[in-house]
Amino acid sequence: STVHEILCKLSLEGDHSTPPSAYGSVKDALNIETAVKGVDEVTIVNILTNRQDIAFAYQRKELPSALKTPAQYDASELKGLGTDEDSLIEIICSRTNQELQEINRTDLEKDIISDTSGDFRKLMVALAKRAEDGSVIDYELIDQDARDLYDAGVKRWISIMTERSVCHLQKDKVLIRIMVSRSEVDMLSLYYYIQQDTK
């Protein structure tokens, strides 16, 4: 937010009794006077003159959340998720196996089970339990998985997407080539074909 940006830019160091020479204090004072006509100017002046205290209090309040490790931050985002499925998807799908272990898989699985339902719950729990990330990519297995996905439909798709490593699933050069080399008409045809095939 704008308030956050302003308060974070205020310096807590140095002598603030005299403004820097480039500081346009007269111009700023006139702008503030114009902006606050008809409001409680005394309160605004009192607040602005105590900006050092405000900045220090604000930064002290923000500091504990800034000191969290990425895993602690993710865990706090997932606690009491309720309906925030976007955060759940982003964290579960983009973190490595090691990062998910740092979040604490037991608590993570409990949170997922308590806050989701149906096939979405099954998919999220399976992703949270996925096998170790492998740095070795088996290209023959990738080709077989692609065929299996095409032939088997959704159930096999969930199995492959949750049991394979992130490296295994990221053959993005092929996708990028297809997206760049095909016209919009071809892409729409592919979309409709896939829609019909998955019904």
Swiss-Prot record:
Keywords: Acetylation, Annexin, Basement membrane, Calcium, Calcium/phospholipid-binding, Extracellular matrix, Isopeptide bond, Phosphoprotein, Repeat, Secreted, Ubl conjugation. GO terms for cellular component: basement membrane; cytoplasm; extracellular region; nucleus; plasma membrane; vesicle membrane. The keyword Calcium applies. The modification N6-acetyllysine is found at residues 37, 171. One of its GO terms (biological process) is positive regulation of receptor-mediated endocytosis involved in cholesterol transport. InterPro entries: Annexin_repeat, Annexin_sf, ANX2. There is a cross-link at residue 37 (Glycyl lysine isopeptide (Lys-Gly) (interchain with G-Cter in SUMO1)). Its main location: secreted. The modification N-acetylserine is found at residue 1. The modification Phosphotyrosine is found at residues 23, 150. GO terms for molecular function: calcium ion binding; calcium-dependent phospholipid binding; cytoskeletal protein binding; phosphatidylserine binding; phospholipase inhibitor activity. Heterotetramer containing 2 light chains of S100A10/p11 and 2 heavy chains of ANXA2/p36. Interacts with ATP1B1. Interacts with DYSF. Interacts with COCH. Interacts (via repeat Annexin 1) with PCSK9 (via the C-terminal domain); the interaction inhibits the degradation of LDLR. Interacts with CEACAM1 (via the cytoplasmic domain); this interaction is regulated by phosphorylation of CEACAM1. Interacts with APPL2 and APPL1; targets APPL2 to endosomes and acting in parallel to RAB5A. Interacts with S100A4. May interact with UBAP2. Belongs to the annexin family. This is Annexin A2. It comes from Mesocricetus auratus (Golden hamster).
